[in-house]
Curated annotation (Swiss-Prot):
Keyword Hydrolase found: no
Keywords on record: ATP-binding, Coiled coil, Kinase, Magnesium, Metal-binding, Nucleotide-binding, Serine/threonine-protein kinase, Transferase
Protein known as: Serine/threonine-protein kinase dst2
Compositionally biased tracts (Acidic residues): 300-322
Cofactor: Mg(2+)
Gene behind this protein: dst2
Residue ranges annotated for the Protein kinase domain, each copy included: 20-276
Broad enzyme group: transferase
GO BP annotations listed: intracellular signal transduction
Catalyzed reactions per annotation: L-seryl-[protein] + ATP = O-phospho-L-seryl-[protein] + ADP + H(+); L-threonyl-[protein] + ATP = O-phospho-L-threonyl-[protein] + ADP + H(+)
Amino acid sequence: MANIAALEPFVGKEDPVELFELIEEIAEGSFGTVYKGKHLPTGNIMAVKIIALDEDETFEDLVVEIDILNRCNHNNIVKYYGSWVKGDELFIAMECCGGGSITEIYQELNIPLNESQIAYVCRETLKGLEYLHHTNVIHRDLKGANILLTESGDVKLADFGVSGLLDKSSKRNTFIGTPYWMAPEVIENRSNPVPYDTKADIWSLGITLIELAEAEPPLSEIHPMKVLFQIPYRDPPKLKNQENYSKDFINFIQSCLQKDPNQRKTATELLKHPFVTNTKEKAVLTDLITKYRKFRAAELEEGGDEDEDSSEQEGMDSDDKDSDLKKSVGTSDRKSTLIANGSTSSLSPPASPSQRKSTGQNLQLPQIIEQQSSSSSSSSSSSLSSQSLQPQAVNKSTDRLSANINGSNTKSNTIDKKTTAAASASASSLNLSTGNLQQSLSGSGSITTNSGVGNGTSGKPTTNGKSSDDRSPDIRTNRKAGRPVTIRKTLEKRNDAVKKIVNAKLMKQQLKDIKKQQQKQQEEEEQLLKQQQKEKDDLLKQNAAKATQQQKQSAAKEEKIQKQHKVEKETLSRQQKADREQLLKKNQSDCSKQRTKVTDQQKQQQREFKDQQKQQQKQKEHEFKDQNKVLDKSTPKKLSKHIAIHQKVIREQEICVQDLVFQQKQDFQKLVDDHQNATQNLFLENKQQSEQLFAWHTQQNQQFQFQQQCQLENYQEYHTVLRENMNAEHQLAKSQLEHSHLSETNHLKERQVTETEQHIKQMTTEQRNSLKEFKLKQTQDFKEFLNKLKKELKDEKGNKKQLQQQHKEQKKQFELTLSTQEVDFQKKQARQKEEEDDILLTHQKESFKRLQDKQQNIIRDIEEHCKLQRQQFETEYTFNEEEMLIEHYRQKKALLKQQHSEQKQIYQEQTQLQYRLLQEQHKESPALLTDQHLKQKESIEEQQKERLTLQQEEHRIQQESLKKQEQKKKGSVTDLPASLASMQLEQSKQLQLLSEQLQAELATMFERHTKETQSLQAELAKAQEKLQSDQQKLLHDLTEEQKKSKLKLKSESPSCKENPLHMKKKSTGTTPPSTSSNQKTLNNSNGASSNGHHHHHHQSAGVGGSGGTISSSHNTPVLPHNMKHQRSFSTSLPSFKFDNQD
């Protein structure tokens, strides 16, 4: 009794025999017998359920039932008061429902429920189901027999023996329930684990509503095993006469009986249906309950009278027989249940009213009745052996027949022999049927009948040799207490009880064998799964090890390449530094040499210019002397002195102007020479830098090509390893799928074979049962005929011949009727066989179709999986190749970018230097011009002042001369009047000529100065145009080189536009050695420093007439001042195009 430990949390410590007094037997549930009992401490009436605890029994279902009852606290669920253990029996005290179950009511009264009664019962059951479903409980055995009524008309749900507990989000995968009320998704759990939930109870509710309306469930005329095959493939059942019912009732049943559980409504949703909302209260059921109680009371009284008569006739021997029969028939009305995964449920449907009239089934069993004929003797009844239970009932019937026919003639004796032979044949066929049933149930392993519970509740005097105190309170103790116990059992009920007892023993053995087989299969499957998992793990480990080794090798190669690259970078940077220092030294030496040469040339030119000036001065002095001589002759001494002074000033001014022009020319030549030297030096430096960059880029390209080759080789090796691993995994998966497919096909074939065998065995058992019934009817008819003959023989002894003739005629008639009945019976059997063969064929075809569909689906899944894996492998391989090409392309692009940026830097430095030179020139040239203008203004002002002074002196001299002449006139009025007038005229003429000469010389001086300034400006403009043209040519060459490199890259770039797996990645190109550290101003080497990875601001340089900017007319672009460079060089994939091209 080790399993009783599972019940300890729910079991009380009191003695149930002292707590309860049993009044009568009410019914039998899925686990035990239910009695009406009185709780002695309080005097309350309760329902006491007594269950026999066998050692072979599993207690999980008992624990589940008690746990659910203990949890539930609702008005529509049977209340639970407690549980106790006494010996090997469990006592469960629950609420007593005196109204009985709904099936008992409509079976006993032979009247189905009307629609208003059904609506009330439906509403109350829905309330109970709603509570259960909210607490995650599935009833799984909802039917009319499990819906109880109290005496006041309250509806209660009972019998949780096969219920299941759910988690919040889980579903069940067990095959439990009663076949006629079972949902399709629950039936499908026979072979495949199909999950189901609380919606299964809604289907059962719909079937119970049809049961209440029609007094039997749908498909009740079919055997329960056949129903299991037909429910999943048939349309949902409907009411037979739908015209007699309301639309709401029909619609409610349709919403319950949806084959798809997702379309089925919940209990809370169904409570809002108009069929339920418009119901009346429990007063609807009061009439039914009162009728049923009256019927039960009358039945109990009749049973008591029959017991008294039989007890007076039989005596002590019959009491002993009754006790033996109670032992054998204690489980006669147990429900046949379906068991899967160790749980039970009832199989057989309740009989219809017509069947109950003929057979007398489904009566309550508080009493066991035995009918015996008054003519049976005590010797024949006492001589019966109680070793085998099944032949016992048959032998009793034969003894009664022989006792009735004792005194007849020889013909009657022969007939009696025939009847005894038929009875023995029926007994043997019954034993055969039990054997066949055992074989059929051992083949399937899914269907059993739970009838072994009544052994402990049918009145054993002692259990396993224990004392009388340990036995449970039963009908015997009730009889001793003075309560009436009626015993009414027909011969058919006894035979059924015997069959159930035999079948229960067989079922237990079969269940044990099935469980052992299932355990073995599970162990084998677990071992196979473990082996497969081990193989998979080993493969995965090998693949991971290979992948890690390859990754390590590739990482080591990359590290070596990076180290070499760093070393090469360092060497290149050192070489570049050394080259730059050498270039700087050379440039400085060249500049110093050129400056010395220029200074020497300038000195020589100055000397030559001075010599020329001296010669010109000598010539002019000679000319002036000649002129002075002429003037001296004609003019007075003072004027000659003034003129000489004036000529000296003019000479000095001319000499200053010539010196200024010569100095300007020399300065401009110096500037031009310096500019040419600087441009040549820059050009040489740029050439050297471009050559170095070209050499560095070629080295880098070679290194990248080598890296790419190494990476491609690594990828190829990695992909070969991956292919091998994938092939191995595919082969493993194929073998596993083939193995699983073979196992499934074998399992399905075995299942088909077992199902066919079960079906054939059921057919044979049904045929045998029908034959037995037919033979029993024949024997009854024959008995009646013999009784009539006996009476006629007693009454008319003299008319033997007439009686013989009548007997022959009746015999012939009886043989004819027998032959016709046999023919009809054979035809019925043939029809039944044809129908069953058709059902079997359809079922086999459907199962074969399912097998084919499953095979096709598995093959499709395998093919799709292989295709997906191939596609993934191909895409990964192509993607890796494309990534390599893209990386190569990006690296090339980065190198080109670096080249372009370096060229830009060089060009920018050149432009900056040119702009600085032009600015210096611009600064120097206007300063010289302003100095010249100032000097010219000063000289002109001085000349004007001298002119004014000369004119004043001339005027003063003229006045003095006039005064002298007047004095002379006064002295000698008449001396030389003509000579004075002539002298005045000559003097005026000379003054005019001198002023004109001075003005002409000044005008010529201005013209010369303007011409020289214009020529200087024109030369500066030409020089600037040359510089700009050179710059534009350089830019044009750079742009053409860039375009060529772009075209080369485009021709070499991979075509990855259509690949959707490419992601946009940032280019990580290697940077060339930077030239920022050694770039300085013009005096040192090259100009301002720049960074290779950023956009630069370019400045424009131009000189106008008075310091303005000049826009070149060439097609090549001149970059404006303070403006970002418009080239972005973005490598956005998969387009592989520059965003902004020139």
